[in-house]
A protein has these predicted regions:
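Conserved NTP-binding/hydrolysis module of P-loop NTPases
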Residues: 441-450
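N-terminal topogenic membrane-targeting module
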Residues: 54-138, 142
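Membrane-proximal, solvent-exposed terminal domains/tails of membrane-associated proteins
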Residues: 171-442, 455-458, 470-471, 481, ...
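Short, internal active-site loops enriched in acidic
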Residues: 156-161, 239-242
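Membrane-embedded segments
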Residues: 148-151
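Conserved P-loop NTPase "ATPase switch" module shared by AAA+ and STAND
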Residues: 449-476
Length: 549
């Protein structure tokens, strides 16, 4: 049995009861019209049946009636979403951001990247040492007297960060692997004040009572995640707005526009799909992260079920590219043509209240949602391949990564730095051998992403990663990753690093990667275009040029 798939064939996307009734009415009207026009009675009956059946025929994942409604809404005046984001002081005095959408109020929890995470990546998917506790989140739909009307798990990220020559090289290096280096995960919690009158009344009633209820629910979600060894925090009002603008590339959600084929964002194309619940699996979700993009968003939607022990689940995705992409060749995706604006809004981390119909949903047992194995953060950059030829990735910079120790030759350090720059790092080099770094720095030619320290001390504060190579190590400011390069591990500082990499004898293509209490031997991998930037390791004749599937 494939436990990575959360739905069974019996949970197929069904035509709604409303669509069936409308189809019957349309069929009857067609038959009546035919009869009035002189068609024999049996011919009118046949016509009525055929028209009714055609009205519910699925095309691209939607019935003909839905396509007709989509076309009508596309060519008529679009509805402008109305919402407001406010700050609310929680019981502890913490400022909590809340987004009001009619009678619904939304709080947003951000999942923090886990420390010491490693990810094994193949063409078919990935296996991480840390997963998002999705089952625990599904259990948070009902919390004592507070019942949430929905939870959206929104993941947004990219394989490589645009802006440097390293970007395209790294994109070719990872090839068909779903190696999403940078990924932010938000959990949007929606509370319907009109559907939980007693819970609101117990907390003071009105908007204040509803605000207290959703704030308490958000705090419980943070605790539930913490109990599963997953750190998280509640966003403030400005952070909620910023999170939405990250996905919409700075466009106010209230002013989004669309064509039939994509949503309009400045200078780019934003397209997407919903997922047929029959095919929702970790393998399908992994495939959504494979195409190179400026930003990919994947949303898992959880809603209360009328059946005990079950939860309604749906999924969708959006991808932002510079030009119109080729259609996804992934079985199980549902077209969003004509409704890309709604689809984009439904993938924002604000759980818009009237867009649940955008994603087909199905009932599944609560304990099966964990089989999706959702990642809590980005996988970081490709470090090497294991003994089975699978790619191994790790984060060597960013939140939760304070110190990285590297014992090896300069080539190893430059490969790490090159890939870090490709995946979004801004690296400052402090070294006693600047000439050894000059070739790489000049080739990348992007001084705001990679340069040697000392040219402008004020701009040095804009970097999030500092490499100490042959100079006295200092303590960088908070939030900055320090990477210490030495020839031997015996030279490392005494403090415990978040991640370490050892290249025996400072040569060759074998390394030992250690993080989070796990150590694994890897082989360095590269491609010719990367070698053109950083050269080759010492004393290696037969060098592995790429990963294996």
């Amino acid at each position: 049995m494939d436990r990575s798939r959360v739905t069974s064939w019996q949970l197929a996307h069904r035509v709604s009861a409303t669509e069936v009734v409308v189809a019957q009415i349309v069929g009857v009207l067609a038959g009546a019209l035919a009869s009035v026009c002189g068609v024999v009675w049996w011919g009118a009956v046949i016509l009525a049946v055929v028209v009714a059946l055609l009205a519910v025929v699925p095309i691209g994942g939607w019935s003909t009636l839905v396509w007709a409604r989509t076309a009508w809404r596309y060519f008529t005046t679009p509805k402008v979403p109305r919402f407001r984001t406010v700050s609310f002081a929680g019981p502890t005095g913490q400022s909590v951001g809340l987004r009001w959408d009619g009678a619904s109020v939304v709080a947003v929890v951000e999942v923090l990247p886990p420390a010491g995470s490693l990810t094994q990546i193949t063409r078919d998917g990935f296996q991480s040492t840390h997963d998002l506790p999705t089952e625990a989140l599904a259990g948070c739909l009902v919390q004592h007297d507070i019942s949430l009307s929905g939870i959206d798990i929104v993941s947004h990220g990219y394989r490589a960060a645009a802006g440097t020559p390293a970007t395209d090289v790294y994109d070719r290096l990872v090839g068909p692997l779903p190696a999403t280096a940078t990924r932010t995960v938000w959990v949007a919690l929606r509370f319907d004040a009109t559907g939980s009158v007693e819970a609101v009344a117990r907390r003071g009633g009105g908007e204040h009572g509803a605000s207290r209820a959703i704030t308490i629910a958000a705090s419980r979600v943070v605790r539930a995640l913490a109990d599963a060894a997953c750190r998280a925090r509640i966003l403030t009002a400005p952070e909620i707005d910023s999170a939405a603008l990250v996905i919409s590339r700075g466009v106010d959600p209230r002013s989004l526009t669309q064509t039939w084929k994509h949503a309009l964002l400045p200078g780019v194309c934003n397209t997407g799909y919903s997922v047929d619940p029959r095919f929702l699996s970790k393998e399908l979700l992994a495939k959504l992260w494979v195409p190179s993009s400026l930003g990919t968003t994947v949303t898992i939607r959880l809603r209360p079920s009328a059946n005990d022990g079950q939860v309604l689940i749906g999924a969708g995705c959006r991808i932002t590219t510079r030009t119109m992409p080729e259609p996804f060749a992934v079985h199980g995706l549902v077209s969003m043509r004509g409704r890309h604006k709604e689809s984009l809004l439904s993938n924002l981390p604000v759980a818009v209240s009237d867009l649940d119909a955008v994603m087909p949903m199905a009932d599944v047992p609560v304990d099966t949602v964990r089989h999706l194995q959702l990642p809590p953060a980005g996988c970081g950059q490709l470090i090497g391949s294991d003994d089975y030829g699978h790619g191994i990735t790790a984060r060597i910079f960013g939140p939760g990564v304070g110190m990285v120790y590297v014992a090896g030759e300069l080539y190893l350090a430059q490969q790490l730095v090159f890939r870090a720059v490709a995946t979004g790092a801004r690296v400052l080099i402090q070294t006693d051998r600047p000439d050894a770094w000059s070739s790489l720095i000049d080739s990348i030619a992007t001084p705001d992403r990679l340069r040697v320290a000392g040219h402008n001390s004020q701009s040095d504060n804009k970097f999030n990663t500092v490499v100490f190579d042959g100079v006295e190590a200092s303590t960088p400011r908070g939030g900055v990753t320090a990477l210490y390069l030495y020839a031997e591990p015996s030279q490392w500082p005494g403090a415990e690093p978040d991640l370490s990499i050892v290249q025996p004898s400072a040569m060759g293509d074998r390394i030992l990667l250690s993080t989070g209490g796990t150590s694994i031997e890897l082989m360095l991998v590269t491609i010719s275009s990367e070698t053109a930037f950083i050269g080759r390791p010492r004393a290696v004749d037969d060098y592995q040029l790429a990963y294996q599937s």
